[in-house]
UniProtKB/Swiss-Prot annotation:
SUPFAM superfamilies according to UniProt: MoaD/ThiS
Organism: Dictyostelium discoideum
GO molecular function: molybdopterin synthase activity; nucleotide binding
Free-text description of this protein's post-translational modifications in UniProt: C-terminal thiocarboxylation occurs in 2 steps, it is first acyl-adenylated (-COAMP) via the hesA/moeB/thiF part of mocs3, then thiocarboxylated (-COSH) via the rhodanese domain of mocs3.
Chief place where the protein resides: cytoplasm
Keywords of this entry: Cytoplasm, Molybdenum cofactor biosynthesis, Nucleotide-binding, Phosphoprotein
Superkingdom of the organism of origin: Eukaryota
Protein name: Molybdopterin synthase sulfur carrier subunit
Any Gene Ontology biological process: Mo-molybdopterin cofactor biosynthetic process
Subunit structure comment from the entry: Heterotetramer; composed of 2 small (mocs2s) and 2 large (mocs2l) subunits.
Length: 86
């Protein structure tokens, strides 16, 4: 069995992948934030370095990069890359 996660994409990640959102499957026993990022890096190596400096938001709350949390298929998950401007 697995969970399917909808991941909302923003800024550079959205530009590189070319979509507003993607779907990722993870086994039930591996449905954590660390495993999600690991799988994203594997599927989309072109955003790997951006993911290293991006924030992960689960249900509109930022998750610390060193915090591995359990995620559920009904959670709202977003990848928030750093934004630069001038």
């Amino acid at each position: 069995m697995s969970n399917q996660f909808k991941i909302l994409l923003f800024a550079k990640v959205k530009e590189v992948i070319g979509k507003d959102s993607i779907f990722i499957d993870l086994p039930l026993d591996e449905s954590t934030s660390f495993n999600l990022i690991r799988k994203l890096k594997h599927i989309y190596p072109q955003i790997s370095s951006t993911l290293e400096v991006s924030l992960l938001a689960v249900n509109q709350e930022y998750i610390s990069r060193d915090q591995d949390i359990k995620i559920n298929s009904n959670d709202e998950i977003a990848i928030i890359p750093p934004v630069s401007g001038g």
